[in-house]
A protein has these predicted regions:
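Inter-lobe coupling/hinge segments of SF2-like helicase ATPases
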Residues: 200-206, 210, 224-661, 688-690, ...
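Accessory, non-ATPase domains that flank or precede helicase/AAA+ motor cores in DNA-metabolism machines
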Residues: 1-364, 371, 376-391, 674, ...
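Short beta-strand elements
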Residues: 519, 675-687, 727-735
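A broad, structural surface signal
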Residues: 31, 35, 84-91, 173, ...
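Short amphipathic alpha-helix segments
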Residues: 625, 660-682
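Composition- and surface-driven signal marking solvent-exposed, interaction-prone regions
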Residues: 161, 448, 663-666, 714-716
């Protein structure tokens, strides 16, 4: 018996299966989907490999085939489906097959299972009670405490007995010798759920919500698996629709994956789901320890949980009876993987749903242009929620403030007069507010006022950001240095910080409103494991009046006490060198505005901008997604950008600028030569950040309406990638 095995080495020349003989002792045990150890190379170094398939015929001379060493992970549940998904990702997004396999079916960490010891009674009740009477007469206090405790419950943990009941070892040993108790051990899963959670009442659905739930259930029962887009205004109750669908799925013995874009959302979502579904739900994210993560996956494999919540990695939960995949806030860029394979979670979830005959449900108040276009064309089913779920709650009043006029009138503060007045009013009424600025740090850049040059990162082509504590930080590679006393280039002492970050905003708020209680939420304040939870919990308990932060504060959070949202710089993402910049600006502003007035009090939103006429800002202020969509799709159609045409970015990365440049031009030359009239190339040029972590980056864009030619071009790029690897040049493809 033979096994085709992919070696766990990311190199283009090894991107194929190697055949190994299965030793007789492991025949019947080795299965597709397992991680194994095999001898590899001339020195027969032990390497980890992944079993793709089994066979009885040797592909080469049997005497030349090496023997597999041992199994290191016997997880082969749902193996065929997950192998198929990994192969699809490899073909769709490039890279190596082993890289896709690592994402979809990661090898289990060598984590020791957590064992718990506990005491149980082993004798009949009469004998137990007789001995208890004797122990009382003899004044054996330790034995009496333990036996009395065991009368009230089936078992007592060893830790509880020793620490809380203060039972000494000799008392335990005596009861064991009398065969009145025995020590047992069982596997204990590390908990990642909230320690305390109030019971969440099941909400009555309104007519819109109920109609959508009924339609999705009836179509599911009829065998319809066409993906569905749930499009609803902020606060319209999409989560409650999810909850009712999940409840129905669990009754059908189906399992559910709920994807959320940000780790910061995990706490609130898991709190809601745990309140409704209890121990049936778990979560997974990058903040968990290896042990915690391993335990949650083990529980999923064993069928001990029915719902897994988390960011994109949760998609690969090893459920065996998947029925529903929910992608909440499906438009978010966080669903794009920045690691190879550079997969998109929405598309990958669609493929997994197809392979498992599951339903894919996408939810958003601001759907991606791609998803809404598919819904308009009938590729997706579209369901709409048009009113807020809380009775009496309505969309907030939104005011756009032209900061050019503020400057003309003499106001040089980052707070417009309208925003300052609303903040004073909000504080006077003991209400809460959120202020959004999508840049962390103190000042965006520190420049010399003599020579005009910014202080840059020595490893990246970006300016360092000023942070509190007189330090400069690169937000791309993490490089940190103390604030210099003079310009490194000309020696001038006149250095100044320009631009606004969350730290400076927090300082200015405290200066203007000294009695206000202020919390800041950004990457700096949430770097610890429970950072998000502590800040959000504190704000939810009204221990602060103002929450200032980056985009992590505006996505999906529900604070009924918030009546004011201030967007300090709405233009910040509008003029990025990305054709989706208008879409991202609209989505961010709409999501931010949607945090206000979610309770019974009316909400107000102030959008500060230097470009108030821009259609992204105007339609966001009106909370009018469809108007934005129709204007944006006209632009995409005119430019043949996705979803109208196919487009991807090709990037060459090397420690030597000359090599990166040479290979990106090689890509351009070969594609032009073969597809000159079918595929359009934009570039090559420097990437927006030309040097990142000491690596040079050159890129180009490929655009086409011919799907066949586009796929052939991807295959050609894969061939070039293998050639470039010889010179230590990496070529990455990112689907736009």
């Amino acid at each position: 018996m033979y096994a085709d095995i992919v070696i766990d080495i990311s190199h283009e020349s090894l991107d194929r299966p190697f055949q190994y003989r299965i030793p007789e002792s492991l025949v019947g045990q080795v299965q597709p989907g397992m991680w194994v150890l095999v001898p590899f190379g001339r020195r027969n170094t032990q390497k980890k490999g992944f079993v793709l398939k089994l066979g009885t015929k040797a592909n080469i001379d049997p005497d030349r085939i090496k023997e597999l060493t041992e199994i290191i992970s016997d997880d082969n549940s749902s193996d065929k489906i997950r192998i198929a998904l990994a192969v699809w990702m490899y073909r769709e997004y490039g890279g190596n097959l082993i890289q896709s396999l690592r994402v979809v079916m990661p090898a289990r960490k060598n984590v020791r299972p957590k064992q718990v010891s506990f005491f149980v009674r082993t004798s009949d009740e009469k004998r137990f009670l007789d001995y208890l009477d004797l122990a009382r007469k003899k004044n054996w206090k330790g034995r009496v405490r333990l036996m009395e405790a065991l009368l009230c419950r089936d078992y007592i943990s060893s830790a509880f007995a020793r620490q809380q009941l203060k039972i000494a070892s000799d008392a335990i040993k005596a009861l064991e010798e009398e065969k009145l108790i025995q020590i047992e051990t069982k596997r204990f899963y590390r908990s990642v759920l909230p320690k305390e959670s109030a019971s969440l009442e099941k909400k009555q659905l309104n007519e819109e919500q109920q109609a959508i739930v009924d339609k999705l259930i009836s179509s599911y029962q009829a065998g319809v698996r066409t993906p569905a887009l749930l499009y609803g205004i902020t606060g319209s109750g999409k989560t409650e629709v999810y909850m009712h669908l999940i409840e129905w799925m669990i009754r059908q013995n189906k399992q559910v994956i709920v994807l959320i874009p940000e780790i910061s959302l995990t706490y609130q979502v898991i709190l809601n789901f745990y309140s409704r579904f209890g121990e049936q739900v778990s979560m997974i994210n990058s903040r968990l320890s290896d042990g915690e993560r391993s335990d949650q996956l083990e529980r999923a494999r064993n069928g001990e949980i029915s719902i897994m919540v988390g960011p994109r990695s949760a998609l690969f939960t090893p459920f065996s009876n998947l029925g529903l995949i929910i992608v909440d806030e499906e438009q978010e860029g966080a669903y794009n993987s920045e690691q190879i394979p550079r997969y998109h979670t929405r598309e990958t979830a669609g493929k997994l749903a197809q392979l498992t005959n599951s339903l894919l449900l996408l939810g958003s108040a601001t759907p991606s242009i791609e998803s809404f276009s598919r819904a308009e064309s009938g590729e997706y089913r579209k369901f709409c929620l048009t009113k807020r779920a809380v009775l009496g709650s309505c969309l907030p009043n939104v005011q756009v403030v032209d900061m050019r006029k503020e400057l003309e009138s003499g106001n040089r503060s980052v707070f417009s007069r309208e925003l300052r007045e609303k903040m004073e009013e909000c504080l006077a009424k003991k209400q809460q507010m959120m202020l959004f600025i999508n840049r962390r740090g103190f000042s965006r850049v520190v420049s010399c006022r003599s020579c005009g040059k910014p202080i840059e990162c020595p490893h990246c082509d970006v300016a360092l950001t000023e942070h509190l504590g007189d330090k400069l930080v690169c937000h791309y590679c993490g490089y940190t240095k103390a604030m210099p006393r003079s310009c490194p280039l000309c020696g001038s002492p006149y250095l100044a910080g320009f631009g606004l970050g969350t730290q400076k905003a927090e300082m200015m708020i405290k200066a203007q409103f000294p009695s206000a209680r202020v919390l800041r939420m950004d990457m700096d304040t949430t770097s610890k494991k429970d950072g998000h939870e502590q800040i959000l919990d504190s704000f939810r308990r009204r221990e602060a009046d103002i929450l200032v932060g980056t985009q992590m504060i505006v996505k999906g959070h529900d604070f009924p006490g918030v009546t004011l949202v201030g967007i300090l710089a709405a233009d910040m993402s509008l003029y990025n060198c990305d054709f989706r910049s208008s879409e991202r600006t609209f989505q961010l502003l709409t999501q931010a505005a949607g945090r206000a007035g979610r309770g019974m009090e009316p909400g107000n939103v102030i959008i500060q901008t230097y470009d108030p006429e821009n259609y992204s800002i105007q339609t966001a202020a009106n909370q009018d997604y469809e108007s934005f969509y129709h204007q944006e799709i006209r632009f995409r159609r005119r430019m043949q950008y996705p979803p109208i045409g196919l487009m991807c970015e090709v990037m060459a990365v090397s420690a030597e600028e000359k090599l990166a440049n040479q290979w990106i031009w090689q890509v351009q030359l070969l594609i032009n030569k073969r597809f000159c009239d079918i595929i359009k190339i934009i570039g090559p040029s420097d990437a927006p950040i030309a040097r990142l972590k000491d690596m040079w980056r050159k890129h180009l864009y490929i655009r086409s309406n011919d799907h066949k030619a586009y796929l052939e071009a991807m295959e050609l790029i894969q061939e070039i990638t293998e050639q470039a690897a010889v010179q230590k040049v990496s070529i990455f493809v990112t689907v736009c």
